[in-house]
Amino acid sequence: MEKIDLLSLTLKEIEEILTNMGEKKFRGKQIFQWVNKGVKTFDEMTNLSKNLRDQLAERTYITNIKIEKKLISSIDGTIKYLFLLEDCNIIEGVVMKYHHGLTACISTQVGCAMGCTFCASTLDGLVRNLRAGEMIDQILTMQEDTGERISNIVLMGSGEPLHNYDETINFLKIINDENGLNIGNRHITLSTSGLVPQIKTLADLKIPINLAISLHAPNDELRQQTMPVAKKYAIDELIDSCRYYIEKTGRRITFEYALIKGVNDRDKDARELGDLLKGMLCHVNLIPVNNVDERGYKKPSIESIHQFQNTLKKAGIETTVRREMGADINAACGQLRRKHLQN
């Protein structure tokens, strides 16, 4: 019998397992609370009988990832982690320190299949999906290591969250549970390259998380140069799915736009982007591209970035420039894992 990862299960799923074992339903709640506190052995569950702990050990297990490497930025205190999974795969996570608390950036897949040319995470393709428990354990491990509570989550590490849809939705349910990490939906941001059917399915669930769309171009021709997913879903389809999401959830959408020197940073690109997004409940986050040596991409000048931002603002689009975090430790997505794998 294949053992079940308890950390990947919702409270309801654990309760069902316990009642099927002939135990009282409340035992499921106790176990859910234990695993989401970060315990890694059944012996630590001191309010359970030894007989029940032994039965759990026979049928289930608790995901346990390890810190393989850790770098701390001397500039802003950002912490970059390489996590070692139980099958010896490597993923990344980042903790960023803000005045409102700690934000964790976590991975949802080992590698990525999306092929975006400005991202180092996708250079070696997709290895496998992460289980919900492996996503949660990134947060638990970060909390244990820092000694502080993680108050905000961004699903912006390696992988496309909506390409691992079922596990990502389970993860959202588990971390939002008041008996677990109890992180509010409005403190969670999911970033997607734009998988249109999944955006609509997510909208129908009406989970009021923050949705961020990796747009990076104002038209299909330009977007297809950097994002293979754009060949499957036209930009008009993507924008329609975003409008549907806003209609269903009432939540503002963030459009992420990686500014690449000489590729998508021209004034005409800014004007076209303003026209595309006009009238939407949205916000544009400009991201000066991180240098990816394999692609030869460079970030634009400060003047070009501000000019692009001002053009969007004149079009009535709320626009910010993302603050660079952990620049001295290669905290950008995919950079550290790739360097580790090459050594």
From Swiss-Prot:
Its cofactor is [4Fe-4S] cluster. Its main location: cytoplasm. GO terms for molecular function: 4 iron, 4 sulfur cluster binding; metal ion binding; rRNA (adenine(2503)-C2-)-methyltransferase activity; rRNA binding; tRNA (adenine(37)-C2)-methyltransferase activity; tRNA binding. Binds 1 [4Fe-4S] cluster. The cluster is coordinated with 3 cysteines and an exchangeable S-adenosyl-L-methionine. The keyword Ribonucleoprotein does not apply. The active site is at 92 (proton acceptor), 333 (s-methylcysteine intermediate). Disulfide bonds join 105-333. Gene3D superfamilies: 1.10.150.530, Aldolase class I. It is an enzyme of class 2 (transferase). S-adenosyl-L-methionine binds at residues 159-160, 191, 214-216, 290. It is found in: Cytoplasm. CDD domains: Radical_SAM. PANTHER family: 23S RRNA METHYLTRANSFERASE, RADICAL SAM CORE DOMAIN-CONTAINING PROTEIN. Reaction proceeds by a ping-pong mechanism involving intermediate methylation of a conserved cysteine residue. Belongs to the radical SAM superfamily. RlmN family. Specifically methylates position 2 of adenine 2503 in 23S rRNA and position 2 of adenine 37 in tRNAs. This is Probable dual-specificity RNA methyltransferase RlmN. It comes from Alkaliphilus oremlandii (strain OhILAs). The gene is rlmN.
